[in-house]
């Protein structure tokens, strides 16, 4: 290289590149270093901007500043070429050799041409509104010093003195023109960048609203440096990342719509998921293996070049060019390796996000297509959350699976080069652990599968618990069902405990392995007769650490692959479930008769594909257009199953089903109304265009106008999830209104009249079913047979069979009717009836929640801002346990101290050997350059005489073999202690994180169970489930993993600083400025990282809720043809979550590249200084080598510490969210336990004293001064119109809501003074909506396990369920999720049986028999009267016969008691409200009274 430089510069080989010539810099140095290099950089940088996309207004002229810069750049590209012409002119035109001038001139010309093109592109891009990239302008000005120095050189050479030669004068003039052009360029950049001319085209969106698109259209430099993240990070630093919309939009290739299209091209039903993922994204992913390969190779360049550089400094005989190459190679390798590894991680995560978008979308699409055999909601949510994430961990593990063995092979070869075959002993020891690792991995995989099953069970149980939280609180089952959840959690933690301790064993084996292998290698080497030297020892130690790196990581890689395989199998099982297939289910041809809408012939249906459940058989059914067909029968006879079969929600085992106009769908109103968490209007429109006239007619037909008039915001009022803020009647009517508004030709109505009072039922029948729907075909299931007298036909079902069909006059007499005596006492009066329906006074009882006047119930999920608070760290510390946490820290410090001690002892040993072998050199002990610094690049050189021991060292024995035995014994002893400390630390850490996982979940569950019902009404289930699923999973696994890395990095840094401080104190001077730089970078990153993590969790909850909502309303979605709209909504929610995930990953890579480049800069600076000192004869090779090795280790540790700390903080957001519920969730006032004994309620007297209840300040009172007294054993019926306050009485009695004033007494005891459990244990309720959970019949009947089987069977017989339960397998028969094995009526009967088991003195019945037939209802009323003859019974009336036998009737109106007397007395009082209700109910027999 010296010869080449000498020829190019025309200088001597001894000094090829002189820095000074006279009073100015050397011309060759100026042209090469100050001109050619900056111009080359300008050319490369400009080329990076050539791909910038143009704005839509690119044809418009740019601003004056841009035009001036373009002109100056063009001139600067021409002047260097003109400058070459005088070079050929004699005499002495050129100041240097022709080759040098041509090289410098051509590089400058190419650079400015490239820059001119880049400026043209930027001027017509979005950058044209500003001055453009600052870096580009600054680099363009870098050649200015070279021009100035060249002018000075000409002046010193006398170019301006006579005789004036044309060649030099021409060149000097061109130089001055170039300086002028460069000055013009600077002025052009300084000019304001905009605005555009007034006639410029305006963007479609205002500039402040135009969304940014991440990465797309950015230059190469911006992509490599992540400069495009600057606006996002600036918003994060200012605290402006408050919602997902504040994050830049996804690149095109990450958009969920694009991913869905690409994936669907490779996906077909029944295909293997991994094949489809490979077809869609696999090729791009495999191509990234090249980056991984190059990065792995570059990992070995650092230690090799470092060794060569130290050798160059030690020998001092190699030419300078070699040193320059080593230094440049070291710096270039560090920079290139950092960029490649960073880009590899970034691109891999982008592929992971692509696969994630595709998997989550296909899971949701599959959920929309599921047939009747569908998994529980909790299991589906686990697939969406846990399993999908574990599956996608494959992307980070696959390339490591081949990259680590490659590293292993190369390291083994280098180790062989150092110690020969002695390395085999250590290798054998390492390989012996491979089968051990295989056994551990197998156990981990098996335990993982079991853990996921237990997690499914837990999440499913929590889902059911949340759906039935009202009944749970009514019955006081929080503790019992909480114990069931804890039992599932205990089984889950049992498997997690096995996994964690196996992981701890794995970590211990591989962490202790380096020292053990080192001992084996050194003993073998000595026994083979070789002499240990410092070079051999430290080189071998470094290579052993490089050997351990792949072996240490390999178990984690295998574990990740195994976890991905487990989750892949679970997702594949879900995707393989049979689909809902209308093409195969229905006949392809419509019914033969044009007037026939529906035809079933020989059709056999079942809820499962093999027909093991109750079957529904229809021999023949033909329904003509416009008919009203009633369906009647006993409870559980198959009425709802018949409608589900027509809707395609059952398995058709055989037969023929033909529907005319199938593509138009059905109007479906299910028995359990499905209501979305949205406004009432949105629920009714259900995605259809708003038609004011039609909407008005639907509201009138469904009797919703009066209800809307009392709601806070009318039809814009938001209702809770599943409509919990509405009464049962309101939910039923909104669901019916939704079906009617869709304007279908065939309607399937499953008992929509069951939950409404008589007035509303008559209104729905005449205005809706016989009114708006009169021109449609209707199938109506109902137990209220009086409303079927005007039906065209009635179907009688029994045991799943259609046994009779005919006109109402033939079929209805076969159905047991209510004795007409009930109707004889009521005299119909048209005037009274008319009076009863006018101006009903209502309150807001139907909306039992805290709503603002705007009607908004669902509030945005709260999100913390700023740094994770100190109390979150304290909460996790306390969850681990203070004693255990201190023990973990102590064992960690002890482990690091013994590791440092082992390396220190080894350095002392080698120092003594060198002293004996080189007595002429009195050298102190060598530096412990192998100080366990977690860096594979350490000490491939002999550190020399740089370490001065702090402690006095023992003198070596004179005998050489005794020395070896002595040193090896001490070394092995220290290593053994280190091994025990490592084991102790691994076990303690596993135990601590397990303790924290158990504690956090237990506190969360307890706090949620103790929350008031208002919290559950205003909070989507998915939001709560996100805590129990994703956040708990993070606290279980992800947080301990990254926290372990953080603690290891922190301990390693402390050990390193201790060594630096004792052995080379001056090196610590570099630490403060380095720490300041690192601090500012990580602080800038952390501000955004925290918010992005929070937004990621925030946007995950709607995905959970949307899937749960979809599964709950699947039949309605498919019947109305709304699946496409819901799929689009899922893509929208997924896009918001993917934004957060992508931005989180990109900001992590932004931090990583800066930390790595700063480390490379430190290494490069030390290497450059070393070369300068070497030229001056001042370099100390050992000092330089030690500095470089420690610089490599120090920067790596600081980078790892910053990265792991920020990731730990991000993971702690999950703990923060758990703590938010644990600490901030409102709790029910528990009261104080009174010393009353277990049987304190002996009589059953109830007294309300001036009770006032308002759901929130500012709303009318739901109960307004209610006062009444119920005597012990009295039967009290409670009636009133919708919203009169009936259900509020029960809420106050059970203290689900606390009254504003007044009190409730039970046997003279104020309920507000009682503990909740003490109160509710003495009360019983039969709820309107039955609550069952997954489990056996026994567990559902007796959740607390208080009764024997004989009592359970007796209660079932009294409720006429014994035969059904026997057919299901007895008391141990499984009911399925939500008790779906039973019909709705059977579920209500099971809840009644549950109440029959109670010993409570007070029973509350909330319209408990609305979904059973009249005959069963009569039998049940007799059972209730007999079983609770001596107890106080409060009955909210729904059917007249349930309260006419009561001792007294309480009539409520607008939250006040207006009447209270016996039924006979009130009936005979003229103009009484009870008589009006009674008379209005007589329009049908039997009459009915108010809804909830």
Swiss-Prot record:
Positions contributing to ATP 1 binding: 633-640
Expression (tissue specificity): In testis, localized to peritubular myoid cells, Leydig cells, along the basal membrane of Sertoli cells, moderately in the adluminal compartment of the seminiferous tubules, and in vascular endothelial cells.
Enzyme superclass (EC): translocase
Ranges where the ABC transporter domain occurs: 598-824, 1246-1479
Gene Ontology molecular function: any one: ATPase-coupled inorganic anion transmembrane transporter activity
EC number: 7.6.2.2, 7.6.2.3
A Pfam family that the UniProt record links to this protein: ABC_membrane
Catalytic activity as recorded in UniProt: ATP + H2O + xenobioticSide 1 = ADP + phosphate + xenobioticSide 2; an S-substituted glutathione(in) + ATP + H2O = an S-substituted glutathione(out) + ADP + phosphate + H(+); 17beta-estradiol 17-O-(beta-D-glucuronate)(in) + ATP + H2O = 17beta-estradiol 17-O-(beta-D-glucuronate)(out) + ADP + phosphate + H(+); leukotriene C4(in) + ATP + H2O = leukotriene C4(out) + ADP + phosphate + H(+)
SMART domains associated with the record: AAA
Stated pH dependence: Optimum pH is 7.5.
Location relative to the cell: Cell membrane; Basolateral cell membrane; Basal cell membrane
A biological-process GO annotation: lipid transport
Membrane topology recorded in Swiss-Prot or TrEMBL: Multi-pass membrane protein
One of the record's GO cellular component terms: basolateral plasma membrane
Protein name: ATP-binding cassette sub-family C member 10
Taxon lineage: Eukaryota, Metazoa, Chordata, Craniata, Vertebrata
């Amino acid at each position: 290289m010296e010869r080449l430089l000498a020829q190019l510069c025309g200088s001597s080989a001894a000094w090829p590149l002189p820095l000074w010539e006279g009073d100015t810099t050397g011309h060759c140095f100026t042209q090469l270093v100050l001109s050619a290099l900056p111009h080359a950089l300008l050319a490369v940088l400009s080329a990076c901007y050539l791909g910038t996309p143009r704005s839509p207004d690119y044809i418009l002229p740019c601003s004056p500043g841009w035009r001036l810069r373009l002109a100056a750049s063009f001139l600067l590209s021409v002047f260097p070429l003109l400058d070459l012409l005088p070079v050929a002119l004699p005499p002495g035109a050129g100041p240097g050799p022709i080759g040098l001038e041509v090289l410098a001139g051509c590089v400058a010309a190419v650079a400015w041409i490239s820059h001119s093109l880049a400026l043209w592109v930027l001027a017509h891009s979005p950058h044209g509104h500003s001055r453009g990239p600052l870096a580009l302008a600054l680099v363009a000005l870098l050649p200015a010093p070279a021009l100035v120095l060249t002018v000075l050189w000409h002046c010193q050479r006398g170019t301006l003195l006579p005789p004036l030669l044309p060649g030099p004068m021409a060149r000097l003039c061109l130089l001055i023109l170039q300086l002028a052009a460069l000055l013009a360029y600077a002025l052009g950049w300084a000019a304001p960048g905009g605005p555009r001319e007034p006639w410029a085209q305006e963007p479609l969106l205002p500039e402040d609203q135009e969304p940014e698109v991440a990465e797309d259209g950015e230059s190469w430099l911006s992509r490599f440096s992540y400069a495009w993240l600057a606006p996002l990070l600036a918003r994060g630093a200012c605290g402006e990342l408050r919602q997902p919309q504040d994050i830049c939009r996804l690149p095109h290739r990450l958009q969920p719509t694009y991913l869905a299209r690409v994936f669907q091209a490779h996906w077909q039903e029944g295909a293997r998921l991994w094949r489809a993922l490979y077809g869609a994204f696999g090729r791009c992913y495999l191509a990234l293996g090249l980056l991984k390969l190059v990065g792995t190779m570059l990992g070995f360049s650092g230690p090799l070049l470092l060794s060569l550089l130290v050798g160059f400094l030690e020998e001092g005989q190699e030419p300078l060019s070699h040193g320059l190459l080593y230094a440049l190679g070291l710096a270039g390798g560090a920079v290139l390796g950092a960029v490649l590894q960073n880009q590899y991680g970034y691109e891999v995560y982008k592929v992971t996000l692509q696969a994630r978008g595709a998997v989550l979308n296909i899971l949701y699409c599959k959920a929309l297509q599921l047939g009747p055999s569908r998994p529980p909601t909790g299991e589906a949510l686990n697939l969406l959350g846990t399993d999908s994430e574990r599956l996608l961990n494959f992307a980070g593990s696959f390339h490591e699976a081949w990259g680590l063995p490659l590293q292993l092979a190369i390291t083994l070869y280098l180790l062989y080069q150092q110690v020969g075959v002695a390395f085999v002993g250590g290798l054998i020891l390492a390989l012996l652990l491979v089968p051990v690792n295989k056994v551990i991995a197998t156990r981990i995989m098996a335990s993982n599968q079991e853990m996921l099953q237990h997690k499914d069970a837990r999440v499913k149980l929590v889902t059911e618990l949340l759906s039935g939280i009202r009944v749970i609180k009514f019955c006081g089952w929080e503790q019992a069902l909480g114990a069931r959840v804890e039992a599932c959690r205990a089984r889950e933690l049992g498997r997690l405990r096995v996994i964690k301790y196996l992981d701890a064993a794995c970590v211990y084996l591989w962490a202790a392995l380096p020292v053990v292998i080192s001992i084996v290698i050194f003993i073998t080497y000595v026994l083979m007769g070789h002499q240990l030297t410092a070079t051999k020892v430290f080189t071998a130690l470094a290579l052993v650490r490089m050997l351990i790196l792949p072996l240490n990581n390999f178990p984690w890689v295998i574990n990740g692959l195994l976890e991905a395989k487990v989750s892949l199998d679970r997702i594949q099982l879900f995707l393989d479930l049979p689909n809902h297939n209308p093409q195969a289910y229905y006949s392809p041809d419509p019914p033969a008769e044009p007037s026939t809408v529906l035809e079933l012939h020989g059709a056999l249906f079942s809820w499962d594909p093999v027909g093991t459940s109750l079957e529904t058989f229809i021999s023949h059914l033909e329904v003509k257009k416009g008919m009203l067909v009633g369906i009647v029968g006993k409870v559980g006879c198959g009425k709802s199953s018949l409608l589900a079969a027509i809707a395609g929600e059952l398995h058709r085992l055989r037969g023929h089903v033909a529907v005319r106009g199938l593509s138009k769908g059905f109007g479906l109103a299910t028995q359990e109304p499905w209501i979305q968490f949205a406004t009432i209007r949105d629920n009714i429109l259900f995605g259809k265009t708003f038609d004011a006239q039609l909407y008005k007619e639907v509201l009138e037909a469904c009797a919703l106008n009066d209800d809307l008039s009392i709601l806070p915001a009318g039809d814009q009022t938001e209702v809770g999830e599943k409509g919990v803020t509405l009464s049962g009647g309101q939910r039923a009517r909104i669901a019916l209104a939704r079906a009617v508004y869709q304007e279908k030709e065939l309607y399937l109505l499953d008992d929509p009249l069951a939950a409404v009072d008589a007035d509303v039922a008559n209104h729905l029948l005449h205005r809706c079913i016989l009114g708006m729907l009169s021109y449609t075909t209707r199938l109506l299931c109902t137990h209220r047979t009086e409303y079927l007298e005007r039906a065209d036909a009635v179907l009688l079902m029994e045991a799943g069979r259609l046994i009779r069909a005919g006109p109402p006059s033939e079929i209805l007499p076969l159905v047991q009717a209510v004795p007409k005596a009930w109707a004889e006492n009521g005299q119909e009066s048209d005037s009274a009836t008319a009076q009863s329906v006018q101006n009903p006074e209502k309150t807001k009882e139907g909306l039992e929640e805290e709503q603002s006047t705007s009607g908004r119930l669902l509030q945005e999920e709260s999100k913390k801002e700023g740094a994770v608070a100190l109390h979150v760290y304290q909460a996790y510390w306390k969850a681990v346990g203070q004693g255990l946490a201190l023990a973990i820290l102590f064992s960690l410090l002890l482990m690091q101290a013994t590791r440092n001690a082992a390396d220190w002892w080894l350095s002392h040993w080698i120092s003594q050997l060198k002293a004996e072998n080189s007595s002429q050199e009195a050298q102190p002990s060598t530096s412990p350059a192998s100080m366990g610094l977690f860096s594979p690049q350490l000490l491939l050189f002999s550190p020399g005489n740089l370490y001065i021991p702090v402690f006095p060292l023992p003198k070596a024995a004179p005998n050489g073999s005794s020395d070896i035995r002595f040193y090896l014994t001490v070394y092995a002893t220290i290593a053994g202690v280190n091994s025990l400390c490592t084991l102790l630390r691994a076990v303690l850490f596993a135990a601590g994180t397990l303790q924290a996982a158990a504690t956090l979940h237990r506190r969360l569950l307890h706090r949620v169970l103790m929350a008031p019902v208002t919290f559950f009404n205003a909070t989507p289930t998915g939001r709560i489930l996100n805590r129990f699923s994703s956040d708990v999973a993070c606290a279980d696994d992800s947080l301990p993993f990254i926290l372990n890395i953080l603690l290891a990095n922190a301990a390693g840094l402390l050990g390193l600083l201790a060594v630096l401080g004792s052995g080379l104190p001056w090196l610590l001077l570099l630490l403060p400025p380095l720490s300041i730089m690192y601090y500012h970078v990580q602080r800038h990153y952390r501000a955004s990282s925290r918010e992005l993590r929070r937004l990621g969790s925030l946007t995950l909850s709607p995905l959970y809720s949307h899937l749960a909502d979809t599964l709950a309303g699947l039949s309605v979605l498919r019947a109305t043809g709304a699946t496409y709209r819901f799929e689009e909504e899922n893509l929208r929610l997924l896009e918001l979550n993917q934004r957060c995930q992508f931005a989180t990953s990109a900001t992590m890579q932004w931090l990583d590249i800066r930390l790595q480049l700063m480390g490379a800069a430190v290494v490069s600076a030390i290497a450059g200084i070393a070369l300068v000192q070497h030229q001056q004869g001042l370099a100390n090779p050992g000092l330089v080598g030690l500095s470089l090795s420690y610089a490599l280790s120090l920067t790596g540790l600081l980078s790892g510490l910053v990265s792991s700390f920020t990731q730990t903080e991000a993971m702690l957001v999950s703990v923060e969210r758990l703590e938010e519920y644990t600490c901030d969730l409102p709790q029910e006032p528990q009261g104080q336990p009174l010393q009353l004994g277990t049987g304190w309620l002996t009589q059953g007297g109830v007294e309300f004293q001036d009770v006032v209840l308002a759901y929130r300040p500012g709303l009318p009172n739901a109960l307004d001064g209610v006062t009444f007294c119920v005597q012990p054993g009295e039967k009290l019926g409670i009636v009133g119109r919708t919203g009169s306050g009936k259900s509020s009485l029960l809420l106050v009695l059970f203290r689900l809501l606390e009254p504003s004033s007044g009190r409730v007494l039970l046997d003279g005891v104020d309920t507000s003074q009682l503990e909740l459990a003490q109160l509710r244990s003495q009360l019983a309720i039969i709820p309107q909506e039955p609550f069952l959970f997954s489990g056996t019949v026994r567990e559902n009947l007796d959740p607390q396990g208080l009764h024997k089987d004989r009592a359970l069977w007796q209660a079932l017989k009294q409720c006429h369920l014994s035969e059904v339960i026997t057919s299901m397998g007895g008391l141990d028969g499984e009911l399925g999720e939500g008790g779906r094995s039973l019909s709705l009526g059977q579920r209500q009967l099971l809840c009644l049986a549950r109440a029959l088991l109670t010993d409570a003195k007070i029973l509350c019945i909330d319209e408990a028999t609305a979904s059973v037939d009249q005959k069963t209802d009569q039998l049940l009323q007799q059972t209730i009267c007999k079983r609770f003859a001596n107890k106080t019974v409060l009955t909210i009336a729904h059917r007249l016969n349930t309260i006419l036998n009561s001792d007294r009737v309480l009539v409520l109106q607008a939250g006040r008691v207006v009447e209270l007397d016996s039924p006979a007395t009130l009936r005979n009082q003229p103009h009484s409200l009870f008589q009006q209700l009674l008379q209005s109910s007589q329009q049908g027999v039997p009459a009915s009274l108010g809804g909830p």
